[in-house]
Curated annotation (Swiss-Prot):
Descriptive protein name: ATP-dependent Clp protease adapter protein ClpS
Organism of origin: Campylobacter jejuni subsp. doylei (strain ATCC BAA-1458 / RM4099 / 269.97)
GO biological process, one term: proteolysis
Binding partners and assembly: Binds to the N-terminal domain of the chaperone ClpA.
Pfam families listed in its UniProt record: ClpS (PF02617)
Domain of life: Bacteria
Purpose of the protein: Involved in the modulation of the specificity of the ClpAP-mediated ATP-dependent protein degradation.
InterPro entries recorded: ClpS (IPR022935), ClpS_core (IPR003769), Ribosomal_bL12_C/ClpS-like (IPR014719)
Gene3D superfamilies: 3.30.1390.10
Protein family membership: Belongs to the ClpS family.
Length: 96
């Protein structure tokens, strides 16, 4: 007796990606925002300065695009660092 096997193919899809967005406020210093962008989002000084100016002029700016778990982790790091430095800086995560 012959046995046949059916192979089931699983279709893998790319994970959803999420934007981490910093929100401008009237208290957090530009230098602190640059520090956050360099330390948490690994931007060089030039890129961090550009992103900081975007946040300052537009009210918000995208710092990076990540999988959900990483985006939420970076959001928490931003909020924790801001609280530690007594700044009201906020970050939000949005699906791309």
């Amino acid at each position: 007796m012959l046995k046949t096997q059916t192979l089931e193919q699983t279709k893998l899809s790319e994970p959803k990606m999420y934007k981490v967005i910093l929100l401008n406020d009237d208290v957090t210093t530009m230098d602190f925002v640059i520090e956050i962008l360099m330390n948490i989002f690994h931007q060089n000084l030039e890129k961090a300065s550009q992103t900081m100016l975007e946040i300052h002029h537009n009210g918000s700016g995208i710092c990076g695009i990540y999988t959900q778990e990483i985006a939420l982790s970076k959001q928490k790091k931003v909020i924790d660092a801001a609280k530690l430095a007594n700044f009201p800086l906020q970050a939000k995560v949005e699906e791309e």
